[in-house]
Amino acid sequence: MCGIVACILKDGSAAPVLLECVRRLEYRGYDSVGIATSDPMIRIKKDSGKIDEVDAELDLADLPGTMGIAHVRWATHGLPTAENAHPHTDCSGEIAVVHNGIIENYLEVKEELESEGHIFRSETDTEVIPHLIEKYMDEGMDLEAATATALRKLRGAYAIAAVSSREPGRIVGARKESPLIVGVGEGEYFLASDVPAILNHTSRVIYLDDGEMVILDGDLRVTDMEGNTVEKEVHSIDWSADMAEKGGYDHFMLKEIHEEPSAVRDTLTEWDEVLGVVEEIGEVERICFVACGTSYHASLVGKYLFESLLGIPTDVILASEFRYSAGALNDRTLAIFISQSGETADTLNALRAANSRAKTLAIVNVLGSSATREAQHVLYTRAGPEIGVAATKTYVSQLTVIYMLVAAMGAPELMDRLERVPEFMERALEDEDGIKELAATCSDVSDFFFIGRGFAYPTALEGALKLKEITYIHGEGYAAGELKHGPLALIDNGVPVVAISPPGPCHDKTLSNVEEVRARGARVIGVGSISDESLRKEADDFIGLDPEVDDVISPLVYIVPLQLLSYHVSVERGLDPDKPKNLAKCVTVE
């Protein structure tokens, strides 16, 4: 996820304002920063690195002009380098663009432009935009028409801001499936990816909708892509700056849970990449997942998928244990290493050990990380930066990649079901108020248990991990059938047991386990289909989910209420769920 800012001031220098605005987007995560101003010549300063580091080297505020654009980049296409940092320009340097999103057909557009003589300087998808605008302006269009024509040629998501020295004093912005707001000041205007960037300058904003453009030139005009004027309402924001960074949510974790439907949609755009990687890998006889923590739980789901749908024997090994139990890897084994950061020390060491013995694939979120450079094959989750320490949206994005991998390797029917997952998630999020009320009644317990069978077992493990990470309550996840082999001794009056039981072949046996714990005084919190009257009857509390979610895709949807439950229990206990004690986002030591 990137952040873009633009401003057109009535007086004063734009560069210091842009620098201050992009600093307020640091929370989104980034690896590069850049600013372009127009006076009317376009001048650019940009580099990879933290804002303070780049500013110390380049003095980003020292650029002339009362208008400009700025960007903080989270790499998706091309490594974090000065060349790949935004803004990007056309051949002549007369047009500059900043962009948030992913252009899916950029390679074919780039090839077409190169055949016409355009020269590219970066590896990014974004650079096709200024070159397309240049092409259409050379044909006689103005900046507004050229930008609209360029965007109609592109597939994917975008929020952009464009300037041209051929039309000084004008900024054009547009959006599709990526947020862009307009800030309305006193005789001056702003564009931004998010409210916090501009709150120091105005609290009056216009929210652009998909397929809309805005033209700033001393005045403000919003149009559709055909140039028809669109009337927009100006909203007043009463958030504090801190709340605005979190999009109005109290914590990043809650914001990121609510971003999960869009995170899955973004991950699904990688389907062509998955198909390409599967073709490169070729035939495999065995799968071996290697991961830690939440990524390990995603791997367990992968084991159930590969074995039940494709019949491929699959192992799941903790990265920290890999050196002791790697087994017989060979050139017909696909070893899959999962890491949000791509820098997890245990996972990297396991990857290095496996590279000479098996086919290796890294599933990561951070472009250019060590895992992406060292694995033979790479797939990206495209979840964007995740600020909360406890993994939420990156978990469902990892799962989505695994499901796509299984689909590409022989179960294509999965894709139709995956396409509906964001819709199911959105319905699950609608029940947050009920989950918040539930959390208030069980925030003072000392133990919590999560049980499930089959595909629900990894969900039980992940639910327990989330709870103990951010609430500091002892939580354990168990295969429901294992209760009688020891854990049942820990069940006592009032102990919460979360029973995860989606529709499917494991449902009836899980219900028997629910009866076991009820007989020993447990407080049962049932999580199942909203139409599951048998589970509802046995449970003290019940969380109902869409009845079309079966056991196979349940890990993607049933985790949502468990994340919400953990979050609200943490808040009830007066804790900060974004920063749990003793934990770090990226574990770079063994």
Curated annotation (Swiss-Prot):
GO biological process, one term: carbohydrate metabolic process
UniProt keyword Coiled coil present: no
Compartments in which it is found: Cytoplasm
Pfam families (UniProt xref): GATase_6, SIS
UniProt GO molecular function: carbohydrate derivative binding; glutamine-fructose-6-phosphate transaminase (isomerizing) activity
Leader peptide range in chain numbering: none
NCBIfam families the UniProt entry points to: glmS (TIGR01135), PRK00331.1 (NF001484)
HAMAP family membership: GlmS
Protein's recorded name: Glutamine--fructose-6-phosphate aminotransferase [isomerizing]
Gene behind this protein: glmS
